[in-house]
Amino acid sequence: HLVDRIEYANGRVDKKAKVQKIRRVLKSETVKIMKKVLEHVVLEGSGKKAQIKGYGVAGKTGTAEKLSKEGGYAKRHHVVSFCGFTPIKDPQFTILVVLDNPAKYTFGGTAATPVFKQVAEGLLSMYGVPPDQPENLKTDKKKEKI
């Protein structure tokens, strides 16, 4: 499940769902590989602006040109995104940021990742999630082969 409850600022809980594990959809080894690949996007690729000091972050950026009414693609109209999770060792939050026609930046790595970072930092702080990475963001992980 993706949502187990909805909590409002006034403390009201709107929905509670039972967690029911049905089946494993990916092999453990596949999950490990995908985590490394998605972490690499944040450490060395287009998702660098999603880095959070002290926390491992993994995710994928996205950029798409919108269709033009005249046919083909509209050159200056984009949908950009970043979907990521943190902390890597024991993920607590999965966040999807989608921006329709961002005003200034037209790539997921420049427009959506800072929004992800701000939301994730707020959630990690609000829920008291302890850091899972050393304070230094540039770890030896970037040298690992994927």
Region spans (language model):
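Short, highly charged C-terminal tails/helix-capping segments
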Residues: 130-146
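Active-site beta-strand/loop architecture of penicillin-binding DD-peptidases
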Residues: 1-22, 29, 38-128
